[in-house]
Swiss-Prot record:
Gene that produces this protein: tbc-11
Knocked-out gene: effects: RNAi-mediated knockdown results in increased expression of the lin-41 protein, which is a target of the let-7 microRNA.
InterPro entries associated with the record: Kinesin-like, PH-like_dom_sf, PTB/PI_dom, Rab-GAP-TBC_dom, Rab-GAP_TBC_sf, Rab_GAP_TBC_domain
Region feature Disordered, mapped onto this chain: 337-383
Organism of provenance: Caenorhabditis elegans
GO MF, one example: GTPase activator activity
Keywords noted in UniProt: Coiled coil, GTPase activation
Name this polypeptide is given: Rab GTPase-activating protein tbc-11
Length: 934
């Protein structure tokens, strides 16, 4: 068995068969080299020797062939190699490879007659070793800058990736490490996270990392730089060990750019994520980006994880730098960046060699294209858009056809031709029911819908399996995306009822995909009836019965058809170890509904319901014929990945799907051969049973039982895990409920005491209120009596002043009259008039002061009238104040009645104070009224 060893300067491949060397006419002619390889391989015999092939790591090296004793049989410079080739994968030369080189007979001569072209042919026991040998040649050709090898330096780095989650609150965060198993982080959605990267240098002289100016994150792998999103840096410093640099950044997964990493993933699904850090190294003239890939599984926000052993996600990097050749500036000690390669990239490059075609050019490695960034991820079931466009005349034709079909029991002859272009999506539900004869089922079993509702209320032993499957069914479709949403509820009901209705088959994994396709076009009851009709009348349930014997029969038939119609592909699949069940099991059990886009799923169901079970063979052969060119170039792992990932992606458009359907229908398949293959399969099985050793049969039976036991144990472990998780969740909810009950009881007790205190306080307030009310009533009565008395006094004063005013006016008028009469009489008397004038002039002031004259009396009377007017004004103001006091008292009374149960003593004291102020103001007015009383 050959082996290969990777040293510093060369790679050695031991135990390689050297088939020989022969001259070539044209060293670039691959057909000539293949023919020579075939001849040497067929002529190999006992003279074939095992050698050690030594391949250098740079273009200036020498290729050597060393025998078992260590003697160099042949050697030639790598630069003389002109071409590398590998044997056809479908032939026995699959493990062979050859190299052509040019040999000069005489040094210094350049004409073609002095140049000899030769080809060395080798054979290995494994095809992978041949691919790795050619990779070594390719790697050597890529290292063309030989002169700088002595100036190059290699440094080894190790990066450790950790993810922390906030297990506390926003105000009091509690950061805990996310558990991970086999490189898969277990994270919870909608929780703030921190990404921590520890970059450690493990080889080479210590480089000084100055800082990290950015950490980037994105979902997926093999991403472009523009796909990564910058995170907010939180920590950026050298650790306790000088060789370790720690970078920490905050990550909010609720941002729409990280929606993929914040969406709950089904149980068997993982999400790739890429973390990159850009660092600046003092000794290097440009920044360096370290990129890591990891996987994560997103759980519910309140998921609880078991304590698992703390492991780390790490990646090793090889950094190649080059010393500067310019010694003019001794202070310039900067190193030039050459390359940075991770161990994962190196291993992935070597593994991809096994998937190479037979002709292997020297440029074996190429970067991933922009359109291949998601090629490693399979399509989610239920993905793709379904065209809703349909011409009006085409739709009218379908409506007329359906109307005639409803009136007649026979299927229209035109339906088979129309189905080839697909049924209009708006009419698929009705047409599918007509194609499957659901109305006949309603006649044969009129109580089927009633049974559906009866089974809904009955317990189901497959409930746990169904619940797990519905989360994996069409997760890319909006109708089934929401957990416990309307779509998942309907899907759960149909799956549960069918498992109870068909006790022999019960529930089988994959049944939910077909049910989901029906639910997208019809209500629950109609979808269930259609599912029953498909399972029983189309023979689909037979595939699930009796240990899947009928399914193995279909595999045998498909294998035989593949040998008849596509023999080269059949031979290739058989050669690399691909069996039919590895890729066709889902095709038969789910009718292509699990992996392919919805547009293709509906087209296939249209054809299946119209043509029957043989449709699966037509579609399968059409798919394999379409993929023939690609499959012939792939190995075992590449083929399985192609069926899982690449094949469904080819039919994401309506045009490609229609092309496949037409190709499948036009595939000239002899259906009578299916019966022949069935009889042959039964005969083979009968011979196997007759010739089988009882011990082997028992061993197989034991193995089958052990497999079932392991499966049941895994299911039991899953159920136990779910049970423990449920118990923990219920315990948590119970603790929360008990805490809430205790808190509520304490609150009720506290409120009861407060209520009793408030009731007692209310009683006291009511008593005080009644007392205040009685005091107020007495004060109001007293004030009213004082007011009425003041009014009476005022009326008497008015009357008295009025009488005095009238009498004074009369006396004044009488005095004036008498005065005028006297003056008139004595005015002509010269003797009396001077005496009168003298008398008027010398009249005694005491007399005039003590004896008021008429004008004095009038003046006093006017003063009295003014005083009376002032008293009237004061009285009016007093009445106004009284009215205001009464209004205020009424307002206070209303407030006291409305708030007596909620307000405390402060408000009541304030009210009493206001009442006292009103009472004192009234008393003040009363005293002022009394002071003006004569």
């Amino acid at each position: 068995m050959e082996d290969f060893k990777d040293f510093t300067e060369v790679t050695q491949f031991t135990n390689v068969q050297y088939l020989g060397c022969s001259q070539l006419v044209n060293n670039d002619n691959d057909n000539e080299m293949k023919a020579l390889m075939k001849v040497l391989d067929e002529q190999k015999g006992a003279q074939t020797i095992n050698v050690t092939l030594v391949v250098p790591h740079n273009i200036s090296g020498t290729v050597k062939l060393i025998d078992a004793q260590g003697k160099v049989l042949s050697s030639f410079s790598l630069v003389n190699i002109r071409f590398c080739i590998r044997g056809e994968s479908s032939t026995s030369q699959n493990n062979c490879f050859g190299i052509s080189f040019t040999h000069k007979i005489s040094v210094g001569e350049h004409n073609s007659s002095d140049i000899l072209h030769q080809c060395h042919v080798f054979r290995t026991s494994k095809a992978e070793t041949a691919a790795k040998a050619l990779y070594s040649f390719s790697y050597a050709f890529s290292n063309k800058n030989v002169s700088s090898e002595s100036n190059r330096l290699e440094f080894q780095f190790e990066s450790i990736l950790e993810v922390k989650e906030n297990d506390g609150t926003v105000e009091k965060p509690s950061w805990k490490l996310c558990p991970q198993h086999n490189g898969v982080f277990k994270v919870r959605r909608d929780r703030e996270k921190k990404i921590v990267v520890q970059l450690r240098q493990i080889d080479g002289f210590l480089l000084n990392i100055k800082k990290c100016f950015g950490m980037l994150l994105a979902a997926g792998r093999n991403l472009r730089h523009s796909d990564l999103q910058l995170l907010e840096m939180d920590r950026n410093a050298t650790g306790t060990d000088s060789a370790v640099f720690v970078i920490e950044a905050n990550w909010d997964p609720r941002v729409h750019m990280f929606e993929v990493l914040n969406t709950e993933t089904p149980r068997d699904t993982r999400v790739f994520m890429t973390v990159a850090i850009d660092v600046i190294v003092s000794e290097i003239s440009e920044p360096i980006r370290f990129s890591m890939e990891a996987m994560s599984r997103v759980f519910h926000e309140h998921e609880r994880f078991y304590k698992t052993p703390q492991t780390v996600v790490s990646e090793e990097f090889t950094l190649v730098l080059e010393k500067s050749c310019d010694q003019s500036d001794p202070n310039d000690r900067k190193l030039t960046f050459i390359s940075l390669e991770s161990d994962s990239d190196r291993k992935r490059s070597k593994q991809n060699l096994g998937k190479s075609p037979s002709r292997m050019p020297t440029q074996l490695l190429h970067p991933t294209g922009d359109d291949e960034s998601d090629c490693d991820e399979p399509l989610l079931s239920g993905s793709g858009k379904v065209s809703q466009e349909c011409k009006e005349e085409h739709l009218e034709m379908w409506d007329q056809l359906i109307e005639n079909w409803d009136q007649q029991s026979d299927r229209p002859q035109k339906i088979s031709e129309l189905v080839l272009d697909g049924i209009p999506d708006k009419l698929r539900g009705r047409v599918w029911q007509l194609l499957s004869n659901v109305r006949i089922l309603a006649i044969d079993q009129p109580d089927l819908v009633e049974k559906y509702h009866i089974f809904l209320s009955q317990p189901c032993p497959s409930e746990q399996v169904i619940m797990r499957d519905i989360h994996r069914t069409f997760p890319a479709h909006d109708y089934f995306k929401e957990s416990q949403g309307k779509g998942q509820q309907s899907l759960y009901k149909i799956s549960k009822v069918y498992s109870l209705y068909d006790e022999e088959v019960s529930y089988c994994q994959g049944l939910s995909f077909l049910a989901a396709s029906l639910l997208l076009h019809m209500p629950e009851e109609q979808a269930f009836c259609t599912l029953v009709k498909i399972m029983f009348n189309y023979g689909l349930r037979d595939l699930f019965k009796l240990g899947f014997d009928n399914l193995h029969l279909r595999f045998f038939q498909l294998t035989a058809l593949l040998k008849d119609y596509i023999p080269d592909l059949s031979h290739h699949l058989e050669h690399i170890g691909i069996e039919t069940h590895m890729y066709a099991s889902q095709w038969f059990l789910t009718l292509f509904t699990a992996k392919f886009p919805l547009q293709m799923v509906f087209f296939i169901l249209d054809l299946f319901l119209s043509q029957g079970m043989n449709t699966i063979f037509h579609i399968s052969l059409a798919l394999l014929d379409d993929a023939k060119t690609d499959l012939l170039q792939l190995d075992f792992e590449g083929t399985l990945k192609y069926f899982r990932v690449s094949l469904p992606r080819k039919y994401r458009t309506e045009a490609s799907t229609k092309c496949l359907i037409h190709k499948a229908v036009k595939f000239r398949l002899n259906h009578s051969k299916l019966e022949v293959y069935e009889n042959e399969y039964k005969r083979i099985k009968e011979l196997e049973r007759e010739n089988e050793d009882p011990v082997l049969r028992m061993e197989k039976e034991i193995g089958r039982h052990q497999a079932n036991t392991l499966r049941l144990e895994r299911e039991n472990d899953d159920l136990a895990h779910e049970l423990v998780t449920s118990k923990i969740e219920l315990r948590r909810k119970l603790d929360v409920a008990e805490d809430q009950i205790e808190t509520s009881a304490n609150a009720i007790e506290r409120l009861t005491r407060q209520n009793m205190d408030i009731l007692e306080e209310n009683k006291n307030l009511m008593r005080e209120y009644e007392q205040i009310k009685e005091m107020y009533r007495r004060d109001v009565l007293r004030l009213e009596e004082n007011g009425s008395r003041a009014e009476k006094l005022l009326a008497e004063y008015k009357k008295l002043f009025s009488e005095r005013s009238k009498r004074a006016e009369n006396e004044r008028e009488h005095f004036e009259v008498q005065k005028k009469a006297i003056i008139a009489r004595i005015s002509d008397c010269d003797k009396c008039w001077p005496a009168v004038c003298e008398w008027e002039k010398n009249r005694s002031p005491v007399h005039s002061a003590s004896t008021p004259t008429g004008p004095d009396l009038l003046t006093k009377l006017e003063e009295r009238e003014d005083h009376i007017k002032n008293l009237e004004i004061d009285l009016a103001q007093t009445k106004l104040s009284l009215v205001e006091a009464e209004c205020r008292n009424q307002d206070l009374t209303h407030q006291l009645m409305a708030q007596s149960e909620s307000d405390g003593k402060k408000w009541f004291k304030k009210t009493i104070t206001q009442l006292k102020e009103v009472g004192s103001s009234l008393k003040h007015h009363e005293r002022s009224n009394s002071s003006v009383t004569p």
